[in-house]
């Protein structure tokens, strides 16, 4: 698709919303909330495998039970269902989140299951584009960078009730070897710290993860080493209808590429958004991931694009969106990564 045509599309449409869950049950210390989203979406691009319908449905619940005055149990489940597949197709559903745990007042919470990795505590701040974004160092089932399985997670807010706005995460991930080699991981741990200066409009965060790699991963052509390691740091401002966030991260022997893994990546993301009173929320962002010291390649951009989008909120449940991914990768990049632009347009119903 010509970039001039894409630009005209971008000028014409608008983008997505977030709302609260619907309370299904709340009685005798037991509470259950149901939430969901229908995203009717179409991609326009010269990249054949992405062009066309990309619609999906997400459904989840969050429940909690009051065990006593100090202890609360909780659980969460979320799944996604493809809306662009034939009814006869397999693999139309995937579990995004599934964990359960307990919270003991100021001492914090502990849970286990499929959850968000510690590094995503930083990366989530820029994962705010209407459709794209959040894909430099954060990837699903890639150690503890995003959603992953086998996570034991301890979270503490306001640091045991002593320091307002200081949040701590400690995480352990058990090994997962019964899957595609790029989705495997050995035992690992992660941690993150976030501080908003006692409830101010500014916040800073940092995270670190370190994991064993599997034997199969070390047999790949690219990216060897016993450990997969990552760190990230971020800044956020959220006030006066303005949202600004940025982060920088580095990974070692972790980020999947053609033929294996990148020995090192340097990653940067930024987003700026403004919420108008009449419902429009324009968005401007940038995402960059540079692969370093790749066998047979050297240094090469893995992700590099400017993102221009907008969201229009009809009300708390309904929105429309457009998101224009302006790809900055070279057409002759040595890893054969697609460099076509993509425009995503659609509507979202959420509850």
UniProtKB/Swiss-Prot annotation:
A GO CC annotation recorded here is: cell outer membrane
Identify a single GO molecular function assigned to this protein. Answer: porin activity
State where the protein is found.
Answer: Cell outer membrane
Provide the alphabetized UniProt keywords: Cell outer membrane, Ion transport, Membrane, Porin, Signal, Stress response, Transmembrane, Transmembrane beta strand, Transport
Signal peptide (UniProt feature, chain positions): 1-21
Identify the InterPro entries for this entry. Gram-neg_bact_OMP, Gram_neg_porin_domain, Porin_dom_sf, Porin_gammaproteobac, Porin_Gram-ve, Porin_Gram-ve_CS
> Is Cytoplasm set as a keyword in this record?
no
| Family matches, as Gene3D superfamilies | Porin
Name it: Outer membrane porin PhoE
Predominant subcellular localization, coarse grouping? membrane
Membrane topology classification: Multi-pass membrane protein
């Amino acid at each position: 698709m010509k970039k001039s045509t894409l630009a005209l599309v971008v000028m014409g449409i608008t983008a997505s919303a977030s709302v609260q869950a619907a309370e299904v049950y709340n009685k005798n210390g037991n509470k259950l909330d149901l939430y969901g989203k229908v995203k009717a979406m179409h991609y326009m691009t010269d990249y054949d495998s992405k062009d066309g319908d990309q619609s999906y449905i997400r459904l989840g619940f969050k429940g909690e039970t009051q065990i006593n005055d100090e202890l609360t149990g909780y659980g969460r489940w979320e799944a996604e269902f493809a809306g662009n597949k034939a009814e006869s197709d397999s693999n139309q559903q995937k579990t995004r989140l599934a964990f359960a745990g307990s919270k003991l007042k100021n001492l914090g919470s502990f849970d286990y299951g499929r959850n968000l990795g510690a590094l995503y505590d930083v990366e989530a701040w820029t994962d705010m584009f209407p459709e794209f974004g959040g894909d430099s160092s954060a990837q699903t089932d890639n150690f503890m960078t995003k959603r992953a399985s086998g996570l034991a997670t301890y979270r503490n807010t306001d640091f045991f009730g002593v320091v307002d706005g200081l949040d701590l995460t400690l995480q352990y991930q058990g090994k997962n070897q019964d899957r595609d080699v790029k989705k495997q991981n050995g035992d690992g741990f992660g941690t993150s710290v976030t501080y908003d200066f006692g409830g101010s409009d500014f916040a800073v965060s940092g995270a670190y993860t370190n994991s064993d790699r599997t034997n199969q991963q070390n047999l790949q052509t690219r990216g060897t080493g016993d450990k997969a390691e990552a760190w990230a740091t971020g800044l956020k401002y959220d006030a006066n209808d303005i949202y600004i966030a940025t982060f920088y991260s580095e990974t070692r022997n972790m980020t999947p590429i053609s033929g294996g893994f990148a020995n090192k990546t340097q990653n940067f993301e930024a987003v700026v958004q403004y919420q108008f009173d009449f419902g429009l929320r324009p968005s401007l962002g940038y995402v960059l991931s540079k692969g370093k010291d790749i066998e047979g390649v050297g240094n090469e951009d893995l992700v590099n694009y400017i993102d221009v989008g907008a969201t229009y909120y009809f009300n708390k449940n309904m929105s429309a969106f457009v998101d224009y991914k302006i790809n900055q990768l070279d057409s002759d990049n040595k890893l054969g990564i697609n460099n076509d632009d993509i425009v995503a347009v659609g509507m979202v119903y959420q509850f």
